[in-house]
Amino acid sequence: MNKRVYISADYDEGSGDRNVVEELNKWSTDNYHKVDFVDMAKVVSGSVSENSDCRKCDLKSEFNSQINASSAVIFVIGDKTASRTAGSGCERMYKEWFLCNCAPYKHNSSGLKTCKHMNTSPSDPNGDFDYINSCSYLRHEFEQAKKRRKKIIVVYNSLYKRESWLPSYMCEYKDVAVPFWVYDSCGNKVGNYQFIKKQLGYE
């Protein structure tokens, strides 16, 4: 049975962790690895971002929906993950809507606009992580997965454990986070499919 798994990673062109995401996505296109991966880049490039007035909060709301529909979330940790701030900066939690300005998502070029949330309410303690927040996209995804009690799998984009790469909000996972890359019996660098498979309950 295929499982839907959400991938959260740093997609920076020059120093991100796309190589891990590409390896994971390869597993979902063959007849051997029965996993349906949904990576953040696909969500960002989807219909919600095509709206000319798409804001950070709209993307976070869509991330919530995609995570809710997934059975597990894989967080790919690279050497720049802890310092990434994309998605942060919203001030709506502290100011009235007419005092807050934000830019539509970067695919659009409409410039700064006044916040569109005139009214807000406390988030449901049993519901989603509030999409109106000052978190980065990466932290938002983590908080949503944790609040929704999803299976969380943390891997380093490395052949070795890199605890210093973990963002502070993920410190509780330092003992269970593992390197994504391993050497096979022929000395080739490959993704640790056996670990991912076990974490997803396939054995």
Label for each model-derived stretch:
Residues 14-17, 82-86, 161-167:
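Short catalytic/ligand-binding loop motif for oxyanion handling, primarily in non-cytosolic enzymes
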Residues 78-79, 158:
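Flexible loop residues that form catalytic
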Residues 1-73, 77, 200-203:
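Conserved N-terminal substructure of TIR/SEFIR domains
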Residues 31-62, 79-91, 98-116, 123-132:
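Conserved BB-loop
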Residues 4, 156-203:
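C-terminal interaction surface of TIR/SEFIR-family domains
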Residues 147-152:
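A short helix->loop->beta-strand "cap" motif at the edges of active sites that frequently abuts
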